[in-house]
């Protein structure tokens, strides 16, 4: 059987089990009887493509929460979030305040990093190479080159291959997802429409990506070559996507997720995990809502458990949502960064 005939989950499970076997052998003091295992370099090499792509895999099935301070970070960790994303303002407030949205204050990021044990991510403006270099120097676990912040470069994204820290990027369709992947992103998330509390755009983007992957699978090689040109990506990445029948990297859902039901819906549509922004901390019940969303994401296959999660919150305490149709074209964040 060829490697590309295995599913993503099968490959992931194999490497997890291989690591477990090595740990068991080491714990029982048997390495001296297995010289080949002793030769394996146990040093962690940061910055390699393998390491950068592996980190997001460990976030699969979990929820990353947007936060602006230490208190919110601690609530997220207590609720079971797999990571936090530090911003200067939550997306809802970015939308309301207008002006230029930039990277969060490094001092706040450091305070968050020292107060919790889960990974800490932070956002940079699209194309802002030096904001990314600062976050890399700061030691964050992942960088989000985000359309929520005001783009620094309207035409180009950061060349992420130059960094030792992994990046996540947003996408509305397969072309955007593969372009970001070819630039060195280690994770993709649907863009949705951040700061609205309206999950409809995240649903649309996830369905578009899934549909375009299905179309890719059924194409001839000649048509895939044409599609690679259309997407402006190397043919090999298109071919790999078709063969493994999914994006080559982890794909999370984001944009407008506000309730446990929203979380379960996006997981049901095929998301590997979730980013939840304003939906938690712009609600009136952030502690319970954070726990409920994490529970729903983890147990989305069991409606009875998601129902219990939904009962943990009050709809009357949910953030005030924004109808996408009421937004002017220039108010849409998702169109930033193609």
Swiss-Prot record:
Residues given in the record as D-glyceraldehyde 3-phosphate binding sites: 207
GO biological process, one term: pyridoxal phosphate biosynthetic process
Active site per UniProt: 123
UniProt-listed Enzyme Commission number(s): 4.3.3.6
PROSITE patterns tied to this protein: PDXS_SNZ_1 (PS01235), PDXS_SNZ_2 (PS51129)
GO terms assigned for molecular function: amine-lyase activity; pyridoxal 5'-phosphate synthase (glutamine hydrolysing) activity
Domain of life: Archaea
Pathways involved: Cofactor biosynthesis; pyridoxal 5'-phosphate biosynthesis
Residues binding D-ribose 5-phosphate: 66, 195, 256, 277-278
Pfam families the UniProt entry points to: SOR_SNZ (PF01680)
Keyword terms, alphabetized: Lyase, Pyridoxal phosphate, Schiff base
EC category: lyase
Recorded catalytic activity of this chain's protein: aldehydo-D-ribose 5-phosphate + D-glyceraldehyde 3-phosphate + L-glutamine = pyridoxal 5'-phosphate + L-glutamate + phosphate + 3 H2O + H(+)
NCBIfam families listed in its UniProt record: PRK04180.1
Function: Catalyzes the formation of pyridoxal 5'-phosphate from ribose 5-phosphate (RBP), glyceraldehyde 3-phosphate (G3P) and ammonia. The ammonia is provided by the PdxT subunit. Can also use ribulose 5-phosphate and dihydroxyacetone phosphate as substrates, resulting from enzyme-catalyzed isomerization of RBP and G3P, respectively.
Assembly, per entry: In the presence of PdxT, forms a dodecamer of heterodimers.
PANTHER family: PYRIDOXAL 5'-PHOSPHATE SYNTHASE SUBUNIT SNZ1-RELATED
Family, per entry: Belongs to the PdxS/SNZ family.
Protein name: Pyridoxal 5'-phosphate synthase subunit PdxS
Source organism per UniProt: Saccharolobus solfataricus (strain ATCC 35092 / DSM 1617 / JCM 11322 / P2) (Sulfolobus solfataricus)
The encoding gene: pdxS
